[in-house]
A protein has these predicted regions:
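Glycine-rich, acidic/polar active-site loops that bind/position phosphate-bearing ligands
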Residues: 2-445
Length: 445
């Protein structure tokens, strides 16, 4: 063991040996939020912790061009964990990594770095940012090792076995995540058939973003052991509820919830109201990151409990931002538009940047809306000055490009690649011939 190793690295090497780990996965995410990894034998752990592991960034979506592709994975010691579902003698552990370039400089296209940078901006203002996402997902049957959209069960909201036949899958996911350090608060069947939700305790935004990636990775891996496909696709089936990732956010200052004011209107502080005002002002641009695919916009339509109108409320779940009833240290704002296809690092960074802009510029939100917005006609919405979220990926990207605050938050590299991905996805979708078109036109014409 090298004498130059830090005390933390030395402790981890002893832990890896004690855990009898044979392989280590060095994980990171691309701009789209897809988890990537390099697997190394445990004997390479010392090198990984002290020097990092080089890889080819040109092969990763949105990372680097081939002529400047050498990149370094630096494991974050705080993210060490065994993968509980990998049983047997060949135990596997993982680290989540930061991505660097030559000279140990942070790579500006690393989503984790984008969030770290934004959290540092908040810290300069005295704030820490906590988030608590609620991830919904579907469990579908597999056929010939390929995922289908055939339901595993016919359960509904809060149903139990035998109607909820995927209870065992959720149980094993909960047990695995608990072993990985999650504090699980609840698990249940969701509204749609074969749709589920597992909730874990909120935490600082970086830890929570790491956990979102881990949650999806673990859920998919364990579902596969049951011969099922877990999908976090926003709208896999038309005509039923899609999957969301409602995200609760709050700021703390000097260890106290900065959103709570017992003497404020609705017991909300000016900080809370400014944060909400900032989120509302930047909502259209945030949508490009929080709803990152063509499919995402098929969820953001009226009638399926997904927000599509830019408004806020204390109780109203048809609003984009809802302030739950709890006060004191639990005071928070729930941002309801994100879906679980999003990159959590970029989404949390944009939420925070928008909120901080609201605080800096004292952006007061409009009056809260306590009416079911889905039941209002366009004239009534116009009178209340309630605008709509973008209706497509291309539209939301156009709003992002006009939003100086969020473009500065994400950085040129990320914005340019999000735009490139938008154009590529939009063209691909536009040129494809869809089953709907065949059903509609083939026999008639």
């Amino acid at each position: 063991m090298s004498s130059n190793m830090s005390a933390e690295a030395t402790r981890l090497l002893k832990k890896i040996e004690a855990d009898k780990v044979k392989f280590i996965r060095l994980q990171f995410t691309d701009i789209q939020g897809q988890p990537k990894n390099v697997s190394i034998p445990a004997v390479q752990a010392e090198k990984a912790l002290s020097e990092g592991i080089w890889f080819d960034g040109s092969s990763i979506e949105g990372f680097a061009r081939i002529e400047e592709s050498d990149m370094l994975l630096k494991p974050d010691p705080a993210t060490y964990s065994l993968l509980p579902w990998r049983t047997g003698d060949a135990k596997v552990a993982r680290f989540i990594c930061d991505v660097q370039t030559y000279g140990n400089k942070p790579f500006e296209g690393d989503p984790r770095f984008v969030l770290r940078k934004t959290l540092a901006d908040a810290a300069k203002m005295g704030f820490t940012f906590n988030t608590g996402p609620e991830l919904e997902f579907f469990l579908f049957k597999m056929l010939d090792s390929m995922p289908t959209t055939q339901f595993k069960d016919q359960g509904a909201y809060f149903d139990l076995a035998p109607t909820d036949s995927a209870e065992d899958v959720r149980r094993d996911v909960v047990l695995a995540l608990s072993e990985m350090g999650f504090e699980i608060e609840a698990s249940h069947h969701e509204v749609a058939e074969s749709q589920h939700e597992i909730d874990f305790k909120y935490g600082d935004a970086l830890t929570t973003a790491d956990r979102v990636i881990t949650f999806k990775f673990a859920t998919k891996s364990i579902a596969l052991q049951y011969g099922l496909h877990a999908t976090f696709m926003a709208k896999p089936i038309a005509g039923i509820n899609g999957s969301g990732m409602h995200t609760h956010g709050s700021l703390a200052k000097n260890g106290k919830n900065a959103f709570y004011d017992p003497n404020g209107e609705m017991e909300l502080s000016d900080t809370a109201l400014y944060y909400i005002g900032g989120l509302l002002r930047h909502a259209k641009a945030i949508t490009r990151v929080a709803n990152p695919t063509i499919n995402s916009y098929k969820r953001l339509v009226p009638g399926y409990e997904a927000p599509c109108y830019i408004s806020w409320s204390v109780t109203n779940r048809s609003a984009l931002i809802r302030v739950p009833a709890a006060r004191g240290n639990s005071t928070r704002a729930e941002f309801r538009s994100p879906d679980p296809m999003c990159n959590p690092y970029l989404t949390f960074a944009c939420m925070l940047a928008a909120g901080l802009d609201g605080i800096k510029n004292k952006i007061m939100p409009p009056e809260s809306t306590n009416t079911n917005i889905y039941h209002l006609d366009p004239k009534a919405r116009k009178k209340l000055k309630i605008d709509m979220l973008p209706g497509s990926l291309a539209e939301s990207n156009a709003y992002l490009l006009k939003d100086e605050v969020l473009c500065n938050t994400l950085g040129d590299h990320v914005v340019e690649n999000l735009t490139r991905i938008t154009e590529m996805e939009t063209d691909s979708f536009r040129l494809a011939v869809h089953p709907w078109e065949l059903d509609r036109y083939l026999a008639t014409y």
